[in-house]
């Protein structure tokens, strides 16, 4: 694995990203690879404050473009303050969600347009695209059922969207798999977690 590699994890709600991130952290530590692990939206104080606004269950009136722009603002601050410095120090960056979430959720599922959401993100990311994106694929029904059984996970505004929205999110990710086949790698997240991680490890070497 190259020094300063930027690796992101993507997937619908309940796909198991957080669990896999922890397993990647353990794997990197065992192999003496310097890394930071972070998430979007959030990862730093300013971005976490924006996250609270985005995911607040009371903000049901939020316009789709407002939502997209808030994600972009959070992303820029997170990149500038945490991700870019780590990459420049030669550390591997593991990020739970990044630009592809905006493209799938706001671009496709919200109907703004993948290219349109990409355009507003290009200003924010300033060329910092992931080197590798691991997409954990799961049927929305299964993912949402997992969330409902997980007492430790706080339910947010996006979790409360109708099933049709979550199906569109998955369709959006499939569009991105077609658009970026060299960067985005699809992993079957319906398997037991140890088998999911075996697939993940194959892309980390």
Curated annotation (Swiss-Prot):
SUPFAM superfamilies: P-loop containing nucleoside triphosphate hydrolases (SSF52540). The keyword Nucleus does not apply. GO terms for molecular function: ATP binding; dTMP kinase activity. InterPro entries: P-loop_NTPase, Thymidylate_kin-like_dom, Thymidylate_kin_CS, Thymidylate_kinase. It catalyses: dTMP + ATP = dTDP + ADP. PROSITE patterns: THYMIDYLATE_KINASE. GO terms for cellular component: cytosol. Its EC number is 2.7.4.9. One of its GO terms (biological process) is dUDP biosynthetic process. The keyword ATP-binding applies. ATP binds at residues 11-18. Keywords: ATP-binding, Kinase, Nucleotide biosynthesis, Nucleotide-binding, Transferase. Phosphorylation of dTMP to form dTDP in both de novo and salvage pathways of dTTP synthesis. Belongs to the thymidylate kinase family. NCBIfam families: DTMP_kinase. This is Thymidylate kinase. The lineage of its organism: Bacteria, Bacillati, Bacillota, Clostridia, Eubacteriales.
């Amino acid at each position: 694995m190259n020094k300063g590699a930027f690796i992101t994890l993507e997937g619908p709600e309940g796909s198991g990203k957080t669990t896999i991130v922890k397993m990647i952290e353990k794997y990197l530590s065992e192999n003496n690879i310097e890394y930071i692990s972070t998430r979007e939206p959030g990862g730093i104080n300013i971005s976490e404050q924006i996250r609270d606004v985005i995911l607040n269950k009371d903000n049901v009136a939020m316009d789709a473009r407002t939502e997209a722009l808030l994600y972009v603002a959070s992303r820029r601050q997170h990149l500038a303050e945490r991700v870019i410095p780590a990459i420049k120090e030669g550390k591997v960056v593991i990020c739970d969600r990044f630009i592809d979430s905006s493209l799938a959720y706001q671009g496709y599922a919200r109907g703004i347009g993948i290219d349109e959401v990409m355009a507003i993100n290009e200003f924010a990311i300033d060329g910092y695209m992931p080197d590798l994106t691991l997409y954990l694929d799961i049927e929305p029904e299964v993912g949402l059922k997992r969330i409902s059984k997980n007492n430790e996970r706080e339910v947010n505004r996006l979790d409360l969207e109708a099933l049709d929205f979550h199906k569109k999110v998955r369709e959006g990710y499939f569009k991105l798999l077609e658009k970026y086949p060299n960067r985005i790698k699809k992993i079957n997240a319906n398997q037991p977690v140890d088998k999911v991680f075996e697939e993940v490890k194959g892309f980390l070497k």
